[in-house]
């Protein structure tokens, strides 16, 4: 009886974890680079910049997954319903590991029960940190 509880707890935990991972096995490849806002495709950023959260500009999608990978490791995924909000600690580790190189972002969008995998785009990471006195703000056009 004492063994049943730990074993059942482990099984329930595994079922819960696998239930939280979206099934992306039915993917439709797309040769287009995804339209995102703000547009971070092919940009160079300082190595100490805050996470570059974004929103896909596609219409009528129900979920989105972004895969971030560096040429020097640190692959991670972020999922969301409408926005991609990157965890700060994973972002910092990825940038520190890939200073002076680039990271690749692959976007998958769930639309009409099909996952559309867009072409990956790079974000280049400068070796230099962000200037201490740099301040910016968003000004409407």
Task: List PLM regions with ranges.
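Bacterial N-terminal signal peptides that target proteins for export
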Residues: 1-8
């Amino acid at each position: 009886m004492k063994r049943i509880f730990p074993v059942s707890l482990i099984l329930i935990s595994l079922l819960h974890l696998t239930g939280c991972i979206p099934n992306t096995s039915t993917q439709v490849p797309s040769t287009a680079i995804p339209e995102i806002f703000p547009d971070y495709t092919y940009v160079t950023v300082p190595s100490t910049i805050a996470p570059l959260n974004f929103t896909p500009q596609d219409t009528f999608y129900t979920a989105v997954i972004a895969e971030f990978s560096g040429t020097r490791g640190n692959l991670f995924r972020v999922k969301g319903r409408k926005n991609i909000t990157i965890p700060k600690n994973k972002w910092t580790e990825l940038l520190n590991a890939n200073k002076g190189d680039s990271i690749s972002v692959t976007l998958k969008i769930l639309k009409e029960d099909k996952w559309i995998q867009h072409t990956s785009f790079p974000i280049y990471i400068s070796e230099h940190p962000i200037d201490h006195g740099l301040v910016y703000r968003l000004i409407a056009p």
